[in-house]
Amino acid sequence: MRAQITISKQNLLYNYSQIKKLSSKEVIAVVKSNAYGLGILEIASILFASGVTFFAVATLEEAIYLRKNNIGGTILLLERTNEYALAYSYQITISIVSLSQIEDIKKSPVPVVAHLKIDTGMNRLGLSKDDINVIKNYSLTNLKIKGVYSHIACESSFMEQEKVFHEICSMIPNTNNIVIHLCSSSYLHKSPSYTTHVRVGIALYGISYIKSLILKEVLSLQVPIVRRKSVKINEKVGYDLEGIIKEEGYLYTVPLGYADGWSKDRLTIAYKDTYLMQVGKTCMDYMMFFSKNKYEEGEYIEIISPSLPCQKMASIYSSTPYELLAALSYRIKRKIIT
């Protein structure tokens, strides 16, 4: 008996429809980092079967995994790669994030299909205005530029970064025939008219940072009670015996630990309109919780649920939904419900 993730197909597709309605753009579904912990194949399969034909991933391995599992359409690789033949064989669109890549592409024995990543101020990855001027003077018959994009660092820098992006886009020939994407989940409502797509990850999964965008939670994380023990005051619990029972009741062991990506000590979990309190340190495979209420072994407790949503938990534990979700391990079983 182990932890399991339940994915709501209905809520995922609802969120997708709301995103399209708000942005009025085509959607690039970002399924990197195992679809933010929800399950890359589970999420991509639902979306592809529902007509989504553009995906973005972080690694070449993720892209190939999708192709091997019959996910069609365009797959954009966000990281830098020099494995051009491998990308070409799986019809992966790469990102050009540095001018030095152009020299590599000159030597490529196969055509390279790419999007240009523009650095508009975040200073992480991307080409500068000067880089674009250099690229314009290259004659590369094996390079096919199919898109251009950038990434916004924060709300306060949006206008400045958008201005830089627009200026650089105007320098690139034939932009009428390529994909242009700037806005991610937090900026869907600000997508400029000259862009063709929005690049959406966390919003697909029910996390909204836009007041007018009401979304539904896609993921529930449940764990079974594998052991119940009656405990008395001052009994000690867990590694280093740091946990101390403060009143008589029941100690419940659940199979979720830092090997599952649940590394922090989560102080509360919701169950049957009440909360259970964690006692002791989080172990590799287990956590222990206390309650005065008596529950049965084999019952499932929800760790993330509509009553304790991801955004609320992230706020309580001084974390972010990105961190909580993306850390969820591959070893947690994923199940799709309609």
Descriptions of predicted regions:
Residues R2-S8, L13, T81, S98-S100, ...:
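Active-site anion/phosphate-binding pocket segments in diverse small-molecule metabolic enzymes
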Residues A3-Y14, K25-V179:
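Active-site-proximal beta-alpha core segment in soluble small-molecule metabolic enzymes
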